[in-house]
Structure formats: structure tokens, C-alpha cells
């Protein structure tokens, strides 16, 4: 089986779950060709894994004018009717105004380059992650090139503007849709015609638990960790407020912030205004190995998000046996069970957040209990080997025209060792 993977920017430091999924499918014998609309910046290539993937990925932008012209001319001559249908689809799914029309023209031109590459490499199917602009390119490329496509629906951003990104049309035209949680699937169902609900399936993002060594918890804790993009949806100002409330009682408390993003300067200023400069370290993007090292030196992982999918970094913390405090946003509660493997606090509530952090700092046995339960949850339900095997089964059966359950089953022909390798 030969399939293509498309994202807007690949590989990125924040999208390691896509790299794991690609690697898992390759281990199962699938020929996966990676495509990306844009080339990531050097700051995203933080590990050898990202650098290797970047070397083997086809980048649509910046376009070679002759390649773009040749691709579209070839597609037009091969099937004028299909080319015109694709133009009509691009027109009907454009965003409002002249700006929307201009962007749709760019997407159509990019789609032609992608479609021709997929045809030349005799690829059977195209799968897209993060179905906003790159999802539009995937949908148009599939129409231009006469092949099937699917996508993974994550959220939260596409649910802010579902009609702008024509989520309804993408679901309706896809062979299948992978939803990262039941919550995510329910939101897709809001915008999809009911006859298309059966093509929406649950495939979790996942991690390899064996890469994480469980942390040993003893005595009082004092080390907090956040990993993620420094953007408004992550609620970091609330985390900083909570830290300021806790410092009088816990004078040795410290927070490490791994990641970068548009809000970094504002967050650093807030840190200074709250008198926390000596307690908060901003270390930027880190490799997967470095993130695992940070987890080994952490007592509590905190994520105060306002909007989410199901954060992979929460899975990583739980796999390392680190107790988590998070908000019950979107699919988070399908991973974090309140008072079983972590604490869930209301979004935007700095007081509740600081109270729960304090409980975990004070109680090593509670940290240990949550850590053990968290690792078990991830191992059982968010194991990348199992999720990739489910995806492999979903792709195979869908391309054969067979129906699939909402939660695809593991292929019974695979030996346990193949699922866990």
C-alpha cells in the first residue's frame, strides 16, 4: 500500500505525534510519502527525527513556476472535465471576499502540484492532518488527481470557524475521517450531514510508553513543568497567576516552560511583573529526548488550557508517571480522570489551579498514585503502536470499500510483538 501524508508544515517540534504515526505505518509495511505545503523553520528541527523527515519530505512551497505550470497543464489535458469540476469545487468552497478568493486560488495551484506528484509516484490514497488550509489543498488535490483522501480531525481551531474551512464539504468528500476523541467526533457531527457520520472514526493520537521511565516521588515536590505552544489557547497567564499565589507558601517552587510561540514576549513580561523571573525558565523548543529529560526532573505537570484537542504532552507526562493538573476542555477528560490519574480544574480559575498544585506538591503518595494510574491509562488507551494498527486497519478496509466500527479494531493477524515493537 502506498499512501501520502500531507500537513501544512512538516515536521514540526509540536507535531511529534504525526511523525510517530508515519513511522508506525512504515513499520507495518506501508509506503508512506510525506508532503508539506511549507518548509518548517530551523527552530522546529530540534532533533534528529525531525531533520531526517525534513530531508525526505516534498515541499510544495516555494513553487517552481515551470513545475506548477506543467502540473496543471498535464492535469487539464488528462481530463478536462475533471479539471473544470475541480475549479468549480474550489470556487464553491472559497472563503468570502477578494482575500478569500485569492487564497483559494493559491490552494488550487498548490493542489495541482501535489496531485501531479501523487500520480507520478502511483500513490493510492492521501491522508491529511490538521484539516484547515492543508485540508483544503488535500480535498482539491484528490479531486484533480482522481484519488481518495481522508483526514485527521483534531481541533480546537477548526471548530472556531468550521464554515470558513468548509468542514462539512471535507467530511462529505472524504473516504473516512479520523477523530482524536469522542468529543472531537461529536463536533464534526454537528457540521456533517447525518449520512456521513458513519465515516467518522476514533483514532487517538498516541505515544510509545516504553520510551518513558516512571518517575519516583518522594517528599515534597517543587518542580512544575509546562510543554506546549506559547499561544492564547494554552492559558499560561492563569498558570503564572497560580504560581504567584503559591510562592509565599512554597518558596522553592519553580516552573519550566518548554516551547515557543507568539505570546512568549507577553508571558515573559507578565513573569517579570509578578516577580517570578527567578522562578520561571523559558527554554524554547526542545527535542523529544530533551522533553523526556525534563519529565524526569518534574514533580507536577500543569496545563491550564482554554481550548484543546487531546494534548499529546499530557500523555507523555502520564507515561512518565508524572501527575497532571489540567482543564476539562474538549477531549482532555477522555484522558485525565479527575482524582484517579490527575486533577481537572475549571478553565480560567487560578485559585482552583493553585489549590490542586499545592495538594500534589505536599503529598508524595498522591503524586505516586496518580502517576501509576496515569501510565496505565496511556498504555492501555493511547499507545501509538495500537493506534497505528487501528489506523492501518481503517485505511485498508476503507480502500477495499468495507465498513468500519466507530472505534476500529486491531488487526487479529498481527502478533502482539508487532503491536508493541
Give, region by region, the residue ranges found by the protein language model.
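A conserved mid-protein helix/loop that constitutes part of the nucleotide-sugar donor-binding site
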Residues: 16, 222, 226-250, 262-268, ...
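Short alpha-helical donor nucleotide-sugar binding micro-motif in glycosyltransferases
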Residues: 171, 285-286, 293-298
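Carbohydrate-associated surface elements
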Residues: 183, 206
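A short, well-ordered alpha-helix in the C-terminal region of glycosyltransferases
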Residues: 252, 279, 352, 359, ...
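Nucleotide-activated donor-binding/catalytic signature segment of Leloir-type glycosyltransferases, i.e.
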Residues: 268-286
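Aromatic "clamp/platform" in nucleotide-sugar-dependent glycosyltransferases that forms part
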Residues: 306
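Short hydrophobic beta-strand element within catalytic cores of glycosyltransferases
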Residues: 323-326, 336
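Conserved acidic donor-binding segment of nucleotide-sugar-dependent glycosyltransferases
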Residues: 338-339, 343-350, 359-364
Amino acid at each position: 500500500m502506498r499512501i501520502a501524508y500531507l500537513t501544512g508544515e512538516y515536521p514540526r517540534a509540536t507535531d511529534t505525534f504525526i511523525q510517530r504515526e508515519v513511522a508506525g505505518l512504515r513499520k507495518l509495511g506501508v509506503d508512506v510519502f510525506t508532503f508539506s505545503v511549507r518548509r518548517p523553520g530551523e527552530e522546529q528541527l530540534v532533533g534528529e527525527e525531525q531533520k531526517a523527515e525534513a530531508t525526505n519530505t516534498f515541499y510544495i512551497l516555494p513553487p517552481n513556476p515551470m513545475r506548477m505550470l506543467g502540473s496543471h497543464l498535464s492535469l487539464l489535458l488528462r481530463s478536462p472535465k475533471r479539471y473544470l469540476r475541480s475549479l468549480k469545487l474550489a470556487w464553491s468552497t472559497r472563503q468570502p471576499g477578494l482575500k478569500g478568493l485569492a487564497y483559494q486560488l493559491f490552494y488550487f495551484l498548490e493542489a495541482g502540484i501535489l496531485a501531479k506528484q501523487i500520480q507520478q509516484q502511483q500513490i493510492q490514497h492521501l491522508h491529511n492532518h490538521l484539516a484547515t488550509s492543508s485540508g483544503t489543498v488535500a480535498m482539491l488535490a484528490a479531486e484533480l488527481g482522481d484519488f481518495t483522501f481522508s483526514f485527521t480531525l483534531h481541533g480546537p481551531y477548526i471548530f472556531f470557524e468550521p464554515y470558513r474551512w468548509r468542514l462539512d464539504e471535507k467530511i462529505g468528500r472524504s473516504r473516512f475521517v479520523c477523530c482524536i476523541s469522542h468529543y472531537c467526533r461529536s463536533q464534526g457531527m454537528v457540521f456533517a450531514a447525518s449520512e456521513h457520520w458513519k465515516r467518522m472514526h476514533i483514532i487517538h493520537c498516541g505515544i510509545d510508553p516504553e520510551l518513558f521511565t516512571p518517575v519516583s516521588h518522594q517528599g515534597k515536590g517543587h518542580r512544575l513543568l509546562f510543554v506546549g505552544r506559547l499561544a492564547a489557547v494554552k492559558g499560561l497567564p492563569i498558570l503564572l497567576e497560580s504560581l504567584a499565589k503559591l510562592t509565599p507558601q512554597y518558596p522553592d517552587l519553580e516552573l519550566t516552560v518548554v516551547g515557543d510561540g507568539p505570546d512568549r514576549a507577553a508571558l515573559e513580561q507578565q513573569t517579570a511583573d509578578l516577580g517570578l523571573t527567578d522562578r520561571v525558565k523559558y527554554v524554547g523548543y526542545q527535542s523529544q529526548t530533551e522533553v523526556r529529560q525534563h519529565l524526569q526532573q518534574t514533580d507536577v505537570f500543569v496545563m491550564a488550557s482554554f481550548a484543546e484537542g487531546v494534548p499529546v504532552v499530557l500523555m507523555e507526562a502520564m507515561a512518565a508517571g508524572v501527575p497532571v493538573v489540567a482543564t476539562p476542555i474538549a477531549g482532555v477528560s477522555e484522558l485525565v480522570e479527575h482524582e484517579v490519574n490527575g486533577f481537572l480544574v475549571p478553565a480560567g480559575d487560578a485559585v482552583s489551579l493553585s489549590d490542586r498544585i499545592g495538594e500534589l506538591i505536599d503529598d508524595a503518595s498522591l503524586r505516586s498514585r496518580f502517576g501509576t494510574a496515569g501510565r496505565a491509562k496511556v498504555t492501555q488507551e493511547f499507545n501509538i503502536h495500537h493506534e497505528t494498527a487501528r489506523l492501518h486497519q481503517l485505511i485498508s478496509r476503507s480502500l477495499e470499500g468495507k465498513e468500519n466500527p466507530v472505534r476500529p479494531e486491531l488487526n487479529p493477524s498481527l502478533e502482539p510483538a508487532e503491536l508493541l515493537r
